[in-house]
UniProtKB/Swiss-Prot annotation:
Transmembrane segments: none annotated. It comes from Arabidopsis thaliana. Keywords: Chromosome, Coiled coil, Meiosis, Nucleus. Residues 60-70, 151-165, 177-187, 221-248, 342-354, 363-385, 392-407, 424-441, 505-527, 541-553 have a biased composition (Basic and acidic residues). This is Meiosis-specific protein ASY3. Residues 7-19, 72-86, 131-142, 209-219 have a biased composition (Polar residues). It is found in: Chromosome; Nucleus. One of its GO terms (biological process) is regulation of synaptonemal complex assembly. Residues 1-40, 58-97, 110-287, 305-586 are annotated as: Disordered. Interacts with ASY1. Pfam families: ASY3-like.
Amino acid sequence: MSDYRSFGSNYHPSSQSRKISIGVMADSQPKRNLVPDKDDGDVIARVEKLKSATVTELQANKKEKSDLAAKQRNSAQVTGHVTSPWRSPRSSHRKLGTLESVLCKQTSSLSGSKGLNKGLNGAHQTPARESFQNCPISSPQHSLGELNGGRNDRVMDRSPERMEEPPSAVLQQKVASQREKMDKPGKETNGTTDVLRSKLWEILGKASPANNEDVNSETPEVEKTNFKLSQDKGSNDDPLIKPRHNSDSIETDSESPENATRRPVTRSLLQRRVGAKGVQKKTKAGANLGRKCTEQVNSVFSFEEGLRGKIGTAVNSSVMPKKQRGRRKNTVVKCRKAHSRKKDEADWSRKEASKSNTPPRSESTETGKRSSSSDKKGSSHDLHPQSKARKQKPDISTREGDFHPSPEAEAAALPEMSQGLSKNGDKHERPSNIFREKSVEPENEFQSPTFGYKAPISSPSPCCSPEASPLQPRNISPTLDETETPIFSFGTKKTSQGTTGQASDTEKRLPDFLEKKRDYSFRRESSPEPNEDLVLSDPSSDERDSDGSREDSPVLGHNISPEERETANWTNERSMLGPSSVKRNSNLKGIGRVVLSPPSPLSKGIDKTDSFQHCSEMDEDEDEGLGRAVALFAMALQNFERKLKSAAEKKSSEIIASVSEEIHLELENIKSHIITEAGKTSNLAKTKRKHAETRLQEQEEKMRMIHEKFKDDVSHHLEDFKSTIEELEANQSELKGSIKKQRTSHQKLIAHFEGGIETKLDDATKRIDSVNKSARGKMLQLKMIVAECLRDD
């Protein structure tokens, strides 16, 4: 949470419910002189109202979108819409998305009624954000002569540079200096208002780094149209056209009686207030186009610059939610159509013819064309362009003196500039210049010719804000497109000497440019007016982006002295004014033209306006002569580039031929070497093959001899075997005969034996029988003897 939160914040829930009045800006500008105006007595009471309204604003931000829309409709009916300079900026930045639709509707309604609102108070016709934008931070108090160069007090601080917004690093230093001036006892009432405004800026830079769309970043329509309107206001102006001065810059933004009728119910109050008051201021500007004055103040609907402002607003909104970004983009288209319908028939037919002759380009380029056409129409209403040029110069000096950041601040803010690339792929929407803790600077849509990237600009200003330009495409890829070559951007030092300063300054940067990107080509476009050789972009277009990128570019920007940048700033402002310049801006397809972007005005301010007043009296013919001289110089550069390319191509062809010859010779050497090696290998293989074949033949011969010998041996062995078998057979037959003989003999022997045995057995039997008989006879005798013996007993 930021240290700069108001008392009516989330930490104080007991505070009142806040209104949805986004009255960050007031209708009239705070006076820069030391003499308080008659309305300065209201400051104290208004500041008290602002503090009380802060509580209501912070609490209503927590509610849902439905409640927020309801409160917006209710707050549209409140006459006094006050906001606090101490409030949190979370609500105001979300409500800027539909500003262009309101402005477009107001423009359409006022297209045929210029000068009808003269009766309204001028304070109610100032854009709602004008005074807040126009308050410089570094120098809240200046003498009347320094600020407006003799113009009336009531139209002070309405220069576009008052709407500038320094980077975050520069902001902190200027806020610190502002605080020191707050402590001075003799500080005037408008100094208090400046303190409040600077405090709000500091809150915007610290409190919401993610959701802020910087309120101080004046939409280009407000910047440029306010700048144009100041041409028609002077010390002798009609009192009805002079805005009623009010030192409080953030209070009286809803006092106009037309605000209630012109506010759409669905739009935020801030955007509605900006639209209504911008329409009124533009009407007054149209009614006083012929008047002379000493300073130019842009109105929201100035015919020269209003359309670009709307386009730039859409470009400057990439940090908003996607829904609002898409809505803003659609609104931008409506605004372009509204302004295109107001063009006269000649300009319209010329634009249609040029569009039919040119291939389709990006939407941003078409937007730039419409813007330049609208610029041309605006210049037709400008009856005194050269007097405007004189009236413009004092404001430039004062604005640059007020808003130039110190070199240390630029160096501190530079590392953060590269973070500004839009990541949603929408090249028509660029980050707004937001005051937050890590400042994300708006990127320069112009592609740097040196490095091929989109260089960020160090500070938003009317001369370097990322607006739609008719002179350069917005959808430039990191690599150069085939159909759209980038615009050659180099600084021009335009002094009273004319073309000498610019040529010297250009030639001083040229070697570095050619060294870095030699193949860079100038952008040449066809034009129905062949007399116009050069188009110098006016500060309200996207060329100011490329101007800002030159100061921040590592190669081109930081080598420029403050005097060069001061004179270059004067060149930017002056190139916007003359009818020939406006005509050149509307002719986007000029034959033989080179589009150059002057350097950024964000440089060291000039304290005195005498040099600018002297330079503002230079004739427009000198400007055209300078343009032609620079165009011729650019053509010479283009021819030199063509010669360099042809020489490079010739040298490249020679190198390629020599290299190809060397490659051919080396190839032949390699081929012969390969053939030699292959022959050696083939011969060696043949020799080895022959040797192997010889050995194989010898082995075959030996095998054949062995085979023959084997056959002989086998036959011999077979014969031996046969003879042996025959012998065996003979022996067997002989054995059989002998065996047969032995058998016969044996049989005879056995028969003889059997006959002898039988005889022997018969004899033995007979002997046994005889023995037995003898034994029985003896037994009988014994028995008889024994018997006799027994009888005798």
